[in-house]
Amino acid sequence: MLTLFAVGFVAMARHVTTTGAFYGFISQGLGQVWGMAAGLVATLAYVVFEGSLIGVFSYFTQSTLDSWWGIKPNWFLLAVIGIVLIALFGHYDINIAAAFLGVCLVAEVLLLAAMAFTVLFHGGGDDGLIAGAINPVNAFKDLAAGGNMPGSSASLGASIDGTAVAAGSAAIGVFFAFWSWVGFETTAVYGEESRDPKRIVPPATMIAVVGLGIFYTFVSWMAVSGTGAKQSIETSAGSNPVDLMKGTFDQYLGHPSTYAFDFLIVTGSFACALAFHNAASRYIYALGRELPAFQNNLGATHKVHASPHVASATQSLITLVITILFWAKMGNDVVQAAYIYEYGVLAVLGTMAILLVQALCSIAVIWYFQVKKVHPGNIVTTGIIPALGAIGMLYVCYLLFSNLSFAGGAASGSLLYKLIPYIVGATALIGLLGCLYIKSRDPALYQRIGRTVLEDAHERD
């Protein structure tokens, strides 16, 4: 489904290069009003994604320090340290952050590959290589209460009655799959900062979707196969699902490998928070540079580092405020405050927002190539495939809406969680009404909305 979306997305990226990727693409395809609405919703998503990852970074860091040395620093202190370090990365040249992210990615891929191929060479665990774990059809089937994992004879038996796992499991499984892939589309965000964006961005996007998608599917398959069907379900439904992967490392690579796993899950969560920080700050910058009141601050870049330093500092401040609010409300319990609420609630909020923007972007691709005919476009790659992508995204949104209470787990009863659809809707409405107001008061400014692109002159018409 994401590949279908990516086909249309990269078709647009070959012609339009802009820091506010969704904002610019949708403005070019569907007009400024929809572009502004999408820009604000996308910004909301990336802003809360950093807060979400800061929460889980704090959780994993405290857990690792406790496991290694028996110390448990306050999660809020760890969160502040993470926010400050990310703020420093965001202030300087993007190449510094890119180098750090690259090192983290390579290290994680190598470690995961070592585990996965070891399991493969062993032929899996007691249940062998479980084919049902990678059957895409099973992603849309609920796990039967007390039943079997598809493709395996292993039963849950009495250890899990199945109701908690079965209820909405397909919908939530698909949702978390999308949450795991969020961020691949940010390749286009860095187009203006790359040397040859029209050559680099399209393949980078497809590699992120297809290449890493195949790799992570393989790794997940090996983790499930190595652990066994029954144990995999029990562990995944337990209080610490990460133990599924960590236990596989312990069993097949030896206990010392779990230390590397612990370290890389801390650096990995930090790297994800950094990546979302960079995306959020560039969306804030893209919106700011087109609005006169913000052009000299949010819309400015650093004279030496060429980074959107004010937008970056603003994003760091927003994340700090979000974290303070969760700490003030939930206290020092790292599981409740950092993991269940800051990480979990904000992840659902951001994913819902970004899914809607992706669906709208697919429609914008069709409009840009097939209706407005700004550029000649293949009917398959800029018409049929984006249409299928949009339908798929909207279907996932429907699944999420239909199973929203299940997705939130222990946090689903909170007021913030119940307000998620309204927060997304209100953000979009502010964008729509704000743009219409600008259109009525300043037509010249309205014409520039979403049109700041690194492109030929006709893209700005």
Where are these regions (language model features)?
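Terminal cytosolic tails of multi-pass membrane transporters
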Residues: 362-385, 403-461
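Membrane-helix boundary/coupling elements in multi-pass transport proteins
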Residues: 18, 41-56, 181, 185-193, ...
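Transmembrane helix-loop boundary segments of multi-pass membrane transporters
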Residues: 64-75, 94-105, 260-264, 321-360, ...
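Hydrophobic transmembrane alpha-helices that form the core helical bundles
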Residues: 2-83, 88-91, 96, 266-269, ...
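Helix-loop-helix connectors at the membrane interface of multi-pass transporters/channels
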Residues: 24-27, 54-77, 106, 111-114, ...
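Membrane-interface loop-to-helix entry segments
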Residues: 75-138, 178, 182, 204-212, ...
